[in-house]
Amino acid sequence: MNLEERVQIAILNKYYGALLTNRQQSILSMYVDNNLSLAEVSDELGISRQAVKDAIDNSLLTLKQTEERLHFVGKDAKLKEIIKNKAPNQIDEATKLELIAYLED
């Protein structure tokens, strides 16, 4: 797993990690945040590598499907882009309406 994938998973986990079980959160954190291999996670938890892989795969599926439905990560990035391109005192009524409309989508 490359750095870009790890960052994307960390972002998804920040938004939707509460939807995972404590066990899934723990395994995903060990694998992604602590950069442990499947074997290292399995040794640490005393479970098979296949069980670790299944937990990671199921966790990632949950996180990705939730983003596909809710689009919170995408909307947040778009809002930050809109705001970044405006000086704080330049957010006029049209921009406010654009932001509100975007949030309501």
Label every model-predicted segment:
Residues 4-17:
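Short, Lys/Arg-enriched N-terminal segment that forms or immediately precedes the first helix
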Residues 22-34:
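Short amphipathic alpha helix immediately N-terminal
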Residues 40-45:
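Short alpha-helical "recognition helix" segments of helix-turn-helix
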Residues 48-49:
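Helix-turn-helix DNA-binding motif, specifically the short coil turn and the N-cap/start of the second
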Residues 55-58:
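Residues within the DNA-recognition helix of helix-turn-helix
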Residues 80-105:
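Helix-turn-helix/homeodomain-like alpha-helical modules used for DNA recognition
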